[in-house]
Design a protein with these regions (language model features):
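Acidic, low-complexity cytosolic segments
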Residues: 1-114
Length: 114
């Protein structure tokens, strides 16, 4: 089960933070930014730090990140992230930083399932 979803721009600015569980704190966004975005040598789409796993994909000029605290099925996590990209493209025509910023309320509604 996902604990949260983050969307960052290329500079590491947090565009979207949606926590689904109480174990997902905003400071986890800083951890991801320091470990992945500011470190160009990171190549793996999965990063585990302690009991927290960050699964991420880069699309256009944004990073989509799923945070899990339990042993989640990685294939399902990435399926969710790629479907979120497709959903964003369907709604906005493209799914990039500008689209997320201009439609952040709708992005939150889509993440909430409303």
């Amino acid at each position: 089960m996902l604990s949260g979803v983050l969307i960052f721009n290329q500079k590491g600015e947090n565009l979207i933070f949606r926590a689904f569980r109480n174990d997902c704190r905003p400071r986890l966004a800083d951890v991801f930014r320091i470990q992945v975005i500011s470190n160009a040598q990171v190549r793996s789409p999965i990063l585990t730090l302690g009991s927290t796993t960050f699964s991420h994909v880069k699309h256009e000029n944004i990073y989509l990140v799923a945070i899990t605290k339990s042993n989640a099925n990685a294939a399902l996590v990435f399926e969710f992230l790629y479907r979120l990209i497709q959903l964003g493209k369907g709604y906005f025509g493209k799914f990039d930083e500008e689209a997320v910023k201009n439609n952040f309320v709708l992005v939150y509604e889509l993440l909430d399932g409303n």
